[in-house]
Structure formats: structure tokens, C-alpha cells
């Protein structure tokens, strides 16, 4: 997925799932499955339920995404 094609949206982590997956409720009301980006995994950034996150969505599958940023 090229960086230019990704759709960036914000949401809130609802629940953690196995294999570093999370259920995220987006600000527009949709709920998606998201995994942690490689840089966040590399630097051991912890994501807990209730955290505000930025998610990149692929234009091909809007039900799955990649968490790229956790707000402080």
C-alpha cells in the first residue's frame, strides 16, 4: 500500500485482540480491525483500551487498518 493511497482517520481503541490486533471505533462510527505498524512494534509502544489512535485504511478494504500513531 503506497503512502499516498492510504486514508488516515482517527479513532478509539475498544478492545485488544490476539496477535497485536485491536478493534478500533472510528470517529465516524464505524468499527474496524487494526494491527500495529512495524515502527510501533519495534519501539514497544503500548496500546491500551481507551487510547486515541491514528489509523491508515486501505482504499481496497475499509474494514482493516494499521495503527500508525498513539496520542499522548
From Swiss-Prot:
SMART domains per record: S1 (SM00316)
UniProtKB keywords: Cytoplasm, Initiation factor, Protein biosynthesis, RNA-binding, rRNA-binding
Record carries keyword RNA-binding: yes
Origin: domain of life: Bacteria
S1-like domain location: 1-72
Cellular compartments annotated: Cytoplasm
SUPFAM superfamilies: Nucleic acid-binding proteins
Chief location bin: cytoplasm
Record's GO cellular component terms: cytosol
Role: One of the essential components for the initiation of protein synthesis. Stabilizes the binding of IF-2 and IF-3 on the 30S subunit to which N-formylmethionyl-tRNA(fMet) subsequently binds. Helps modulate mRNA selection, yielding the 30S pre-initiation complex (PIC). Upon addition of the 50S ribosomal subunit IF-1, IF-2 and IF-3 are released leaving the mature 70S translation initiation complex.
Subunit record text: Component of the 30S ribosomal translation pre-initiation complex which assembles on the 30S ribosome in the order IF-2 and IF-3, IF-1 and N-formylmethionyl-tRNA(fMet); mRNA recruitment can occur at any time during PIC assembly.
Name of protein: Translation initiation factor IF-1
Organism in which the protein naturally occurs: Syntrophotalea carbinolica (strain DSM 2380 / NBRC 103641 / GraBd1) (Pelobacter carbinolicus)
Amino acid at each position: 500500500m503506497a503512502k499516498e493511497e492510504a486514508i488516515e482517520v482517527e479513532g478509539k481503541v475498544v478492545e485488544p485482540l490476539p496477535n497485536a490486533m485491536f478493534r478500533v471505533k472510528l470517529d465516524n462510527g464505524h468499527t474496524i480491525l487494526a494491527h500495529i505498524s512495524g515502527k510501533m512494534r519495534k519501539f514497544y509502544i503500548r496500546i491500551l483500551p481507551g487510547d486515541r489512535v491514528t489509523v491508515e485504511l486501505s482504499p481496497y478494504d475499509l474494514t482493516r487498518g494499521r495503527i500508525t500513531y498513539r496520542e499522548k
